[in-house]
Amino acid sequence: MPLYENKELSDNDLFRSVVLYGRNVASYKFALAKSLLEIDTTSSEIEIANLAVPFAKNICDHLIKNEKQVTSKTSKFLEACKRFNNAEINEEELKQTTIRMGFVNVIDAFHIVAREETTRFFTDNRSSNNSIILTDNFYKLKEKDIYGNLKNEAESRWNLWETAISLNVNPLLLQIINDDDQECLYVLDEKKKRQNITSSR
């Protein structure tokens, strides 16, 4: 049964499934989820040009903490983000690069979980106006008290994912340890060195 036909799952559950269980060969799905939860969504039509900078800066922030943001060896888009962090290109150049390269696959792949399509939180309108259009399902998320938690959950999952691929470990197999005193979660790398991944609060 496709996820969107499962009546027991709420829109919140389905959005979480995208973030938690969606197939990821790069961190773009996390960046897109966070950006959609952060930007002004008064208008349901979001132009890629307006989404580009928040999306790219989320990735730039994570590159500072962990350079491993893709399972492949290289990415021209990630190289541009690194150049921005190193002040080698400006924000406008980062924006234009993101418009060209940043959304090539993530828009199509966002709603795929376990090779099935889940409920759509936006539709692809790039062929008509280089934009996406938020659906009623997205706006239903904003009606819930836990809407603010979704961004934190996306961040936590992103931290876990990037830690796992930097250690060459399947994220599902990563052993996570809870530090009650410091209220954080961490893992041990191959040298038994501690790596904090997220708050446990």
What are these regions (language model features)?
Residues 1-200:
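Mixed-charge, low-complexity interaction segments
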